[in-house]
Amino acid sequence: MAVGKEIKTKIASVKNTQKITSAMEMVAASKMRKAQEGMAASRPYATNIRNVIGHIALGNLEYRHPYMEERETKRVGYIVVSTDRGLCGGLNINLFKKVLADAAEKQASGAEVEFGVVGSKATSFFNNMGAKVSAQISGLGDSPSLTDLVGSVAVMLKAYDNGEIDKLYVVYNKFVNTMTQDATIDQLLPLPKSDDEEISHRWDYIYEPDANSLLDKLLVRYIESQVYQGVVENIACEQAARMVAMKAATDNAGDLIDDLQLVYNKARQAAITQELGEIVAGAAAVG
């Protein structure tokens, strides 16, 4: 029964792996719920800032901030949000394919591209492919704060201010539901027009110290909050993808255990049959 012992060892090994994947599935589910709460909490902040920016812009039509002005696109920047860890299916690779396809279109029209990367997966991917990486950060954990991202965002904003890039995008996985995560590219700069800016109503507010200074600060905060929102959404997507991947691994382990158990039972039955045959043959020989 040497074969039977090997199969029993394999079954025990797969059962141990199944326990690990099952535990990881439960942990990912818990973290996903927490990430969803953070995602929902951060949305109103960015929305309200965007509304205030629209109000100031409408009330101060003689001043156009550089972040609101379209210019010829010679250089494009992408802030790519990825995960620090794996075991989350094709979440990262699908995102990288999306941004590389978009970057290829920009390059085909004569534009240069550069990247700011968030997460160790994007850091290693874009550095290994020899892309121009202007800013990088990783190790944010499951509960990052907006201040963690300020430095990397500032590098890309400075490049925009200096005319080193003419358009800036944030690339992340958008959380739709547990089973669906969409690789998304949102334009940050120049600031896309909102519905508020399409209307002709002007708001009569008094700003201190002045509207222009306030607009400068708010636009930077808005860009930071949009990147932060992308990071939070990506975390929710990561945990959802990991939960699904670990559930699939747990289910596959169960199927493998059933198959191995069947093989073990057949091997055991064959061994018993062989032993009985030998006993009968021995008895016949003695008789």
Swiss-Prot record:
<dbReference type="InterPro" id="IPR023632">
    <property type="entry name" value="ATP_synth_F1_gsu_CS"/>
</dbReference>
<keyword id="KW-0375">Hydrogen ion transport</keyword>
<keyword id="KW-0813">Transport</keyword>
<dbReference type="GO" id="GO:0005524">
    <property type="term" value="F:ATP binding"/>
</dbReference>
<keyword id="KW-0997">Cell inner membrane</keyword>
<dbReference type="GO" id="GO:0046933">
    <property type="term" value="F:proton-transporting ATP synthase activity, rotational mechanism"/>
</dbReference>
<keyword id="KW-1003">Cell membrane</keyword>
<dbReference type="InterPro" id="IPR000131">
    <property type="entry name" value="ATP_synth_F1_gsu"/>
</dbReference>
<keyword id="KW-0066">ATP synthesis</keyword>
<dbReference type="InterPro" id="IPR035968">
    <property type="entry name" value="ATP_synth_F1_ATPase_gsu"/>
</dbReference>
<dbReference type="GO" id="GO:0042777">
    <property type="term" value="P:proton motive force-driven plasma membrane ATP synthesis"/>
</dbReference>
<dbReference type="GO" id="GO:0045259">
    <property type="term" value="C:proton-transporting ATP synthase complex"/>
</dbReference>
<dbReference type="Pfam" id="PF00231">
    <property type="entry name" value="ATP-synt"/>
</dbReference>
<keyword id="KW-0139">CF(1)</keyword>
<comment type="subunit">
    <text>F-type ATPases have 2 components, CF(1) - the catalytic core - and CF(0) - the membrane proton channel. CF(1) has five subunits: alpha(3), beta(3), gamma(1), delta(1), epsilon(1). CF(0) has three main subunits: a, b and c.</text>
</comment>
<protein>
    <recommendedName>
        <fullName>ATP synthase gamma chain</fullName>
    </recommendedName>
</protein>
<keyword id="KW-0472">Membrane</keyword>
<keyword id="KW-0406">Ion transport</keyword>
<comment type="function">
    <text>Produces ATP from ADP in the presence of a proton gradient across the membrane. The gamma chain is believed to be important in regulating ATPase activity and the flow of protons through the CF(0) complex.</text>
</comment>
<dbReference type="GO" id="GO:0005886">
    <property type="term" value="C:plasma membrane"/>
</dbReference>
<comment type="similarity">
    <text>Belongs to the ATPase gamma chain family.</text>
</comment>
